[in-house]
């Protein structure tokens, strides 16, 4: 199994620009992203950094939680990444990055445009959100290594609190980020 990647410069640059919005959850969110990106690389068999579109999508994929104070964060996250890509004249990445964000909580396998990046990203996020209970064939030892290198720092606890609050507010739509 490959060695975990220790730095994702594009992702870190983006996170730095949103540090105030993310506040005390910054380290937990950064580590979540690092775990997801490492799981993505392992699922794809990549050695080294994933492409720029992946690193950008990873940085923005849950960002709407903090910027818009909502668990229905996919549309705000796409809006933020679209503004980011426009400001850098990287419009050619919009479709792929938007698909990566919008479909990362799809319940079933993803088979549409950009499936070669979207599906492993979806799986990598699920590996992390499930705390490694869902593995998609990754060795348990690799998952544990990545988890120990990039500890939780309260990320999963924050998700549980937000989910409980969402359930109380809207019991018929408790997890608005999930896609069928």
Language model regions located:
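Membrane-interface starts of transmembrane alpha-helices
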Residues: 90-95
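Short gly/ser-rich anion-binding loops that grip negatively charged ligand groups
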Residues: 26, 67, 71, 87
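Divalent metal-dependent phosphate-bond-processing catalytic cores, especially two-metal-ion Mg2+/Mn2+ enzymes
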Residues: 2-9, 19-47, 60, 89, ...
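An active-site-proximal "capping" alpha-helix that borders the catalytic cofactor pocket
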Residues: 36-40, 72-87
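His-Asp-centered metal-binding catalytic motifs of divalent-metal-dependent phosphohydrolases/nucleases
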Residues: 50-68, 77, 98-105
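Glycine-rich, flexible beta-strand/loop modules in the N-terminal catalytic cores of phosphate-handling
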Residues: 15-16
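Hydrophobic alpha-helical segments of small multi-pass membrane proteins
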Residues: 81, 102-103, 125-126
